[in-house]
Structure formats: C-alpha cells, structure tokens
C-alpha cells in the first residue's frame, strides 16, 4: 500500500513536470497577453489619451466637453475650469470631481468621467529618486488602440535562451538613466550576468527598483545591440529575470526571445529608461521595432 502510494505520487509528479509548458509555449502565451495589455483591456496602454505627471506641489485640471470623449485633456493651469482637479501635497493625492471629493482608493482604481472615459492614477518615480504621481485619461475609443495590429517578434530561437552566472554588486549603487520624456529615472545596479552567445563572452549589468536584498525578487537589463535602430527599437530593449528564489542567485536563465520594447515605443505617455548597455551582436530575438515591423 505504501509503495503503491509512493508510485502514484511519483507518477503524478512526473505528469506535472511533463505537463509544464515549454519555453516557446510560454513565449507565445506572453505575446498574446501583451496584445491584450496594449489594446484590449479596459485600461490598455494604447487607450491612454492623455497623462499628467505630478511632482509634490503640482496641480492638474481635466478639461473637456461632455459627450465628446476625445476632448478630455489635462491642463497645468490651476485656474482652469474642468470636471476633475488633482493636487499632490506632501506626498498625498487629493482629487475633486465637479467640486466633490473623490475617495483616495478610487483614484487608483477607476474614476468615471464620461461615456468611454475614465481616469486612473498611481504613485511613480517622476525624476531620479523623486516620487510623485502619474494620472492617465483612458478613452475606450482611442484611435491608437483601434488601429493596433499586435506586437511583432522575431521567430523563437532556443539559442537565445542562455544560462548565465550572476555576480552581485555588494554596494548596489544607484544609476540614473535618461528617459524618453527627457526626465531622469533611478535604478540600482544589483549585479552583472556573464554568459556566452554566438561564441562571444558577454557581460550585462542588471538593475532593480530597490537596493534592499530582501525586496529584490526580479531584475532587468536595458540593452542595445547591433540591430538597435535597424529592425529593433531605437532606444533599446529590456529583458527581465525572475523566479530565481532568494537574492542573490548564483545562476539565472535569460531568454532573449522574451526581450521587449519599453511602452514608450508605442506611447508618449510613459517614461522609459533609454538603454545604454551594449551587446555586441545582432540579437535576432525578442520584439521587433514597432515602426518597421508591420
């Protein structure tokens, strides 16, 4: 009986392992999810009609005409007349709609404005090491979402899935990146990965949003390569690493087939670090330049 139970458990474990999706299947699923995030979900990135980035002390007013979803825009003039007024003071966001206060919890979830129009806000880094808020206006009929043809990736190539040695940086210093909006954004250099690809030894820095080892559950590389601006997005691409357990890992798996473009490749409403680190290869893996792919 005991042996039978062990065999049954072992078979179940084998079947679970056997049923685990292959890397290429995960990649395909990720592309489908990315298409949804860009254009299909209620708060899809390409449904953003306007954005306001607030530093402490800033005020923004949402102007527009009822019944005209495309008319809603933010005004930095505190004297402007509009349906929504947002202020950030001492790190606290306050919002009023037609003069009535909006609950703080609603700001991060959904503030209805008009047919097909709502507003959502979240804390974000508005300058290097400076926290503020980002407020988006979503329009369900926004043309960019309607005309979206889907993301385009190079065909999956298992050669671009590599095992890498990770060397942590004990100091985890801050590094400031220029962004697509002309501002600065701060990340922490948490270490370097070393791997071999196409016969070349490559070292690539890794960055995280925190320098506290207890809070580091993932990190990313912002890289350029020989295809940057020549079939791959001109400001570089990103690749994320997670599922390594406790930081720091000794080795990690990097699948460059999952390398993706920053949101800024398709929308001006995000602040994305411009990649500075180089891979001296033509990386025919990951997402293509959206401006030339279709």
Task: Locate each region found by the language model.
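Surface-exposed beta-loop interaction hotspot
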Residues: 126-187
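Extended, aromatic/histidine-rich regions of cofactor-dependent oxidoreductases associated
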Residues: 228, 251-253, 257-294
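Forkhead-associated
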Residues: 48, 53-108
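Bacterial Sec-dependent signal peptides at the C-terminal "C-region" and cleavage site
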Residues: 17-25
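Bacterial N-terminal signal peptides
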Residues: 8-15
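Positively charged n-region of N-terminal signal peptides that target proteins for export
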Residues: 1-5
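Flexible, glycine-rich surface segments
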Residues: 165-227
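Acidic, glycine-rich flexible loop segments
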Residues: 222-258
């Amino acid at each position: 009986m005991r042996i039978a139970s062990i065999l049954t458990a072992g078979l179940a474990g084998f079947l679970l392992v056997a049923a685990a999706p292959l890397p290429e299947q995960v990649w395909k699923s990720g592309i489908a999810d990315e298409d949804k995030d860009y254009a299909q979900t209620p708060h899809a990135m390409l449904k953003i009609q306007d954005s306001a980035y607030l530093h402490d002390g800033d005020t923004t007013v949402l102007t527009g005409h009822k019944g005209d979803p495309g008319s809603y825009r933010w005004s930095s003039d505190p004297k402007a007349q509009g349906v929504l007024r947002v202020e950030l003071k001492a790190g606290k966001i306050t919002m009023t709609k037609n003069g009535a206060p909006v609950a703080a919890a609603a700001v991060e979830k959904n503030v209805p404005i008009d047919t097909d129009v709502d507003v959502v806000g979240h804390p974000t880094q508005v300058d290097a090491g400076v926290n503020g808020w980002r407020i988006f206006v979503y329009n369900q009929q926004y043309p960019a979402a309607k005309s979206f043809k889907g993301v385009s990736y190079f065909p999956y190539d298992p050669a671009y899935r590599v095992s890498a040695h990770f060397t942590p940086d004990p100091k985890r210093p801050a590094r400031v990146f220029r962004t697509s909006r002309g501002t600065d954004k701060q990340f922490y250099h948490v270490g370097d990965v070393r791997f071999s690809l196409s016969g070349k030894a490559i070292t690539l820095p890794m960055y995280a949003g925190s320098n506290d080892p207890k809070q580091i559950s993932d990190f990313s590389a912002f890289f350029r390569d020989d295809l940057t601006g020549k079939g791959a997005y001109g400001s570089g691409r990103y690749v994320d690493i997670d599922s390594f357990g406790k930081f720091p890992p000794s080795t990690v798996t990097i699948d460059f087939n999952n390398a993706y473009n920053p949101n800024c490749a398709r929308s001006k409403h995000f602040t994305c670090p411009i990649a500075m680190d180089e891979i001296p290869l033509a990386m025919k893996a990951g997402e293509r330049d959206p401006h030339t792919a279709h």
